[in-house]
Amino acid sequence: MFQDKGWILVTLITLVTPSWAAYKLQERYSWSQLDFAFPNTRLKDQALASGDYIPQNALPVGVEHFGNRLFVTVPRWRDGIPATLTYINMDRSLTGSPELIPYPDWRSNTAGDCANSITTAYRIKVDECGRLWVLDTGTVGIGNTTTNPCPYAVNVFDLTTDTRIRRYELPGVDTNPNTFIANIAVDIGKNCDDAYAYFADELGYGLIAYSWELNKSWRFSAHSYFFPDPLRGDFNVAGINFQWGEEGIFGMSLSPIRSDGYRTLYFSPLASHRQFAVSTRILRDETRTEDSYHDFVALDERGPNSHTTSRVMSDDGIELFNLIDQNAVGCWHSSMPYSPQFHGIVDRDDVGLVFPADVKIDENKNVWVLSDRMPVFLLSDLDYSDTNFRIYTAPLATLIENTVCDLRNNAYGPPNTVSIPKQAVLPMGPPLYTKQYRPVLPQKPQTSWASSPPPPSRTYLPANSGNVVSSISVSTNSVGPAGVEVPKAYIFNQHNGINYETSGPHLFPTHQPAQPGGQDGGLKTYVNARQSGWWHHQHQG
């Protein structure tokens, strides 16, 4: 009888567990410290003995997915980083702590070999034409230890042949003595030659545009929106208080192509809680670098504790962004006003998501998040007996489900209030991508994690699959009689265990207290719900 009551009690507890306890992001890879795929043990031992490889000095900061490869960047902030641009062969390493393979090879990761190699890479981007865009900062060190053996250079690789097809050095007029560029956004227009890249100069306070077709770049400088907010320079991450008050424009995302044939670039300074926007019609026009001040638009603030370094937008207008103060990933549907009540939290974790450094959406609408505990690495000491670096993944549809970003749960919703100055609508050409830059994108298997045979030499892409990529159906927006109505998803969250802060006008989900019984507490607490992985649950037996 008592056993029956206990079973009933457990059942009731399970039923009333709030939705925030069910992690959506699932851990795919994790490391205590990074390891690299040296050609053999002898060379690895030599690198360790010489100081060319110091495992404790390596920190991953960027991630990108294409086919069966997951790219990871490791900047040369300290000595002993053997490669800065690397990847994981996902066919050979389904999960665990795989060695990082230099891309495209070891020779191309030689520090200081400016014309032939990449010295330091941060954020990278794969475009829909099968090209990998990498900005080499040419730097070694960080802060006061920084040296510049090489100039800033854009490197573009063809992922079907694993060869570099373009290297472009930024001219001196596009940089200044304070320049530090870590972020990149890539804008593909009518075809693969109609491509532009945008670079955020975080400490030089500028935005640089590069045209693939013209092989030329130009700089937008001194706009006040590129500068840090003097009231937002205080940070608290993992129990560490620090000040990054000089950090300007950093995170960027691009909207889908609008009716006028252009996208909207959204951006935020790191020391800021506010988002800004500008049409790529302005950025693509070199003649507008000096007279475009009023073409930039200021949006609302996200709310307290909402610094962000990484953002990405899906092709149906869903923006994801990291919230480094909250150990969380947030969302916003760009058809809604940029107001805090329309911002959601898709996942949060005070252990696994300490500093979610990079967020990406791949060609199959799967989300990838890299967390690296960066402030602990820079300002304190990492515990190398603990897991420090993690890569998570989940379908975009799963992440936004039952949040304000899922318009399937919204009865009302006004159109987007981001007002870009109107221009005459230009006719759009068909999206005809040239064959040499648009390979067929393979679809990841959804029913089995069985290893595929080793790929042939120099070809790491899996065989083409006929799987159909599922899309997120989005209902059309309607405006309620009173104007802005509260979405159903917002009410759903309130009635399913997600509490909201009410300090001021900002409404963000608040983190629930940790349940008793955790192991050691703090960063040493293990996140068993994540480490199990949805692929293990779905494919046992």
Swiss-Prot record:
Any idea which UniProt keywords this protein has?
Developmental protein, Glycoprotein, Secreted, Signal
> Where does this one sit in the cell?
Secreted
One Pfam family matching this protein: MRJP
Question: Which residues of this chain are annotated as glycosylation sites?
Answer: 144, 215
Q: Which gene encodes it?
A: y
User: What is this protein's function?
Assistant: Controls the pigmentation pattern of the adult cuticle and larval mouth parts.
Per the UniProt entry, what species is this protein from, by scientific name?
Drosophila melanogaster (Fruit fly)
The family annotation for this protein states: Belongs to the major royal jelly protein family.
Protein name stated in the entry: Protein yellow
* Effect of deleting the gene: Flies fail to pigment the adult cuticle and larval mouth parts and show reduced level of locomotor activity and male competitive mating ability.
- Record region (Disordered): 443-463
| GO BP | cuticle pigmentation; developmental pigmentation; male courtship behavior, veined wing extension; male mating behavior; melanin biosynthetic process; melanin biosynthetic process from tyrosine; regulation of adult chitin-containing cuticle pigmentation
